[in-house]
């Protein structure tokens, strides 16, 4: 039962943080596409670690992460309005690079698959 509740809370907080980032942060420098991949809320509901994926080059990712880090307190305040919990968790934004790593591995596998076809001929 506890795992089910934790999963529901994680999903609800994820939806709320995603909505806040997309709709409520009014910074003209936020032009990259930002996706909230996963949110882990601690058992005591004090902290929420949000993993985000940012589309763009490294400089744009760094700039976007700096903006999001500075907006953590605003996101927490808005999260308190959006999700009714005993405590409003402190939001910690982390960059998730798993999608880029997966794409890199796929490219390597395709390259290997292509070289195997050429070797068999």
Curated annotation (Swiss-Prot):
Q: Provide the assembly information.
A: Monomer. Binds 30S ribosomal subunits, but not 50S ribosomal subunits or 70S ribosomes.
Q: Name the HAMAP family on file.
A: RbfA (MF_00003)
Report the domain of life of the source organism: Bacteria
The organism of origin for this protein: Clostridium acetobutylicum (strain ATCC 824 / DSM 792 / JCM 1419 / IAM 19013 / LMG 5710 / NBRC 13948 / NRRL B-527 / VKM B-1787 / 2291 / W)
Localization recorded for this chain is:
Cytoplasm
What keywords were assigned to this record? Cytoplasm, Ribosome biogenesis
Q: Which GO terms describe its cellular component?
A: cytosol
Q: Which InterPro entries match?
A: KH_dom-like_a/b (IPR015946), RbfA (IPR000238), RbfA_dom_sf (IPR023799), Ribosome-bd_factorA_CS (IPR020053)
What name appears for this protein in its UniProt entry?
Ribosome-binding factor A
Q: Which residues form a coiled coil?
A: none
For whether the record's keyword set contains Cytoplasm, the answer is yes
Q: What family is this?
A: Belongs to the RbfA family.
| Any Gene Ontology biological process | maturation of SSU-rRNA
Looking up Pfam families in the UniProt record yields: RBFA (PF02033)
Gene Ontology MF terms: ribosomal small subunit binding
Q: What does this protein do?
A: One of several proteins that assist in the late maturation steps of the functional core of the 30S ribosomal subunit. Associates with free 30S ribosomal subunits (but not with 30S subunits that are part of 70S ribosomes or polysomes). Required for efficient processing of 16S rRNA. May interact with the 5'-terminal helix region of 16S rRNA.
């Amino acid at each position: 039962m506890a795992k089910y509740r934790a999963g529901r809370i994680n999903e609800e907080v994820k939806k709320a943080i995603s909505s806040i980032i997309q709709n409520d942060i009014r910074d003209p420098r936020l032009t990259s596409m930002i996706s909230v991949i996963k949110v882990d809320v601690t058992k005591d509901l004090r902290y929420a670690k949000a993993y985000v994926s940012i589309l763009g080059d490294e400089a744009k990712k760094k700039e976007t992460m700096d903006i999001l880090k500075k907006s953590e307190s605003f996101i927490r305040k808005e999260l308190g309005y959006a999700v009714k919990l005993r405590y409003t968790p402190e939001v910690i934004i982390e960059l998730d690079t798993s999608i880029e790593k997966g794409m890199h591995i796929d490219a390597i596998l395709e390259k290997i698959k292509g070289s195997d076809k050429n070797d068999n001929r």
